[in-house]
């Protein structure tokens, strides 16, 4: 798949759809890499209702799950194995979340290196459907990313 190119990435992006599972485990003692931890702290300190009690915990568990996945993949793969990830930037209220940067850090910690990254402007986002978001930010400047990691 190393020679997939931008056109091949379009097909990969079109076939991807994800869902989130919410864990109720207490993950407050688990360390995250610096950029992930910084995001969780920003969400926890946000003035919006539920930021401290729910959303910061949800995001922490989500990021820990990504790290766990990257670590398990690394342990199951030989050096030079590839992992391809399609992910879209996101928002928490008025905070833009650069998911590509977070994934690079989480996968890097688990023994993966980014070999190539394609970024695509996203003309709209599902988060724009919520009427309450319009007061928080302008039209979505989000990007979707295809990251090709290699096991080091």
PLM feature segments, named:
Residues 1-152:
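S-adenosyl-L-methionine-dependent nucleic acid methyltransferase catalytic domains
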């Amino acid at each position: 798949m190393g020679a997939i190119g931008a056109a091949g990435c379009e097909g990969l992006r079109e076939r991807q759809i994800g869902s989130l599972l919410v864990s109720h485990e207490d993950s407050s003692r688990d360390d995250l890499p610096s950029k992930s931890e910084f995001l969780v702290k920003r969400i926890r300190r946000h003035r919006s209702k539920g930021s401290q009690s729910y959303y910061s915990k949800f995001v922490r568990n989500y990021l820990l799950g990504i790290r766990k996945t990257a670590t398990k993949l690394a342990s199951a793969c030989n050096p030079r194995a590839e992992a391809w990830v399609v992910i879209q930037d996101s928002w928490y209220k008025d905070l833009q979340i650069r998911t590509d940067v977070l994934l690079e850090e989480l996968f890097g910690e688990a023994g993966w290196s980014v070999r190539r990254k394609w970024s695509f402007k996203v003309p709209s986002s599902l988060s724009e459907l919520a009427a309450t978001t319009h007061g928080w930010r302008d039209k979505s400047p989000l990007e979707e990313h295809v990251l090709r990691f290699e096991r080091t």
